[in-house]
């Protein structure tokens, strides 16, 4: 298995499928892993639980929903940004929440970008493709 470049953390299967489809059409989803909640995301990132023993390479970007079961996106973001080994991983919140407290909290915790999911399919598709191009091909993270 290749190193995961995009970790998609999304509990809504329709949104996950649209995101994967948009990235696949532009050949940006070759190394994408979809997890369904925040607990699974943290297990993957920290190589614990069902991911224990996996090669612990870090994704190039995490696309993170906020409103999820078990562990919500804000809790995931807080754990990632407060941990020395993961604080530099770019995290893009991709959510339906336009709530100012959510936006403020995410930026206070160190989110790299906060994107409200467009309602229309074509707008959603375009936004996801642009995110993929930027975070995988244009952005230069620290090594």
Regions found by a protein language model. Name each.
Residues 66-68:
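Receiver (REC) domain active-site loop signature in two-component systems and cognate sites
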Residues 112:
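Short, glycine/charged-rich "phosphate-handling" switch motifs in NTP-dependent
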Residues 10:
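Conserved acidic carboxylate
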Residues 92-94:
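Hydrophobic/aromatic residues positioned on beta-strands within the core alpha/beta folds
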Residues 40, 119-132, 136, 140-143:
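C-terminal output helix
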Residues 18-20, 33-61:
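Acidic, metal-coordinating helix/loop segments flanking the phosphotransfer/catalytic sites
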Residues 70-71, 80:
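Hydrophobic residue at a beta-alpha junction
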